[in-house]
């Protein structure tokens, strides 16, 4: 019987092997906050235009172990000036066993980033508030939908070139 210590789930795979998902480590890989509009931005009425970009990548670390990084970049413009730029790279080390190859890309490209998102969202909010700006609560993200859209773009890209600046960087770099 496979051990489940509360960090993952188990279930039967086609091969008869149990599936196992475990979060081994969450870590803040990189963080950046710039406020080129400060202190003038604090005098203006706050009606910002927000630009949020998401990116993911993953790489194997060893047998059944993967490093996944979610990058979120937020640019706030107020009165046509950049008030702040905030970027967080939230990383996680995941152990995956027993998943069919067809499911691995989906787990790494959608499920793992979804686990990282709450931590990245909190880090961004903390940085924005410490920068003197109103809190920023990013809306939930449907990573499964983003993954499917990127997968379709990649499949269509076999006959014509795919756009290079896609929001999730192809799920893999």
Curated annotation (Swiss-Prot):
Instruction: Tell where it localizes.
Output: Cytoplasm
Q: Ranges of Polar residues compositional bias?
A: 158-167
Name a single GO biological process. Answer: protein folding
InterPro entries in alphabetical order: SecB, SecB-like_sf
At the top level, the lineage of the source is Bacteria
Annotated region Disordered: the residues are: 148-173
Swiss-Prot/TrEMBL keywords: Chaperone, Cytoplasm, Protein transport, Translocation, Transport
Q: Which PANTHER family match?
A: PROTEIN-EXPORT PROTEIN SECB, PTHR36918
- The protein's assembly and partners: Homotetramer, a dimer of dimers. One homotetramer interacts with 1 SecA dimer.
Regarding protein family, the annotation reads:
Belongs to the SecB family.
From the Swiss-Prot or TrEMBL record, give the protein name.
Protein-export protein SecB
- Source taxonomy lineage? Bacteria, Pseudomonadati, Pseudomonadota, Gammaproteobacteria, Chromatiales
